[in-house]
Amino acid sequence: MSFLKKSLFLVLFLGLVSFSICEEEKRETEEEENKDETEEQSEEKKRFEPVPPGFTPFRLT
């Protein structure tokens, strides 16, 4: 009986450790994806700078 308890605790402990490692890796990949998305958004903002009010690209004379 004691052998079964120790084996069960060992299996549960190893499962918990592997699960936490997987969650950590998942969190890191999500952070990297979010970082890439924010970099892309900032690049888009740089391309499209705000236009002052009343500005027209056409020359009116």
Swiss-Prot record:
Species per Swiss-Prot/TrEMBL record: Pithecopus azureus
Principal location: secreted
GO biological process: defense response; vasodilation
Cross-referenced InterPro entries: Frog_antimicrobial_propeptide
Name of the molecule in the record: Probradykinin-1
Assigned protein family: Belongs to the frog skin active peptide (FSAP) family. Bradykinin-related peptide subfamily.
Propeptide: 23-48
Lineage, broadest ranks: Eukaryota, Metazoa, Chordata, Craniata, Vertebrata
Acidic residues: bias regions: 30-42
Keywords associated with the record: Amphibian defense peptide, G-protein coupled receptor impairing toxin, Secreted, Signal, Sulfation, Toxin, Vasoactive, Vasodilator
Start and end residues of each stretch annotated as Disordered: 24-61
Cellular localisation: Secreted
A GO CC annotation given for this chain: extracellular region
Signal sequence segment: 1-22
Summary of the tissues where the protein is detected: Expressed by the skin glands.
Task of the protein: May produce in vitro relaxation of rat arterial smooth muscle and constriction of intestinal smooth muscle. May target bradykinin receptors (BDKRB).
Protein origin, superkingdom: Eukaryota
GO molecular function, one term: toxin activity
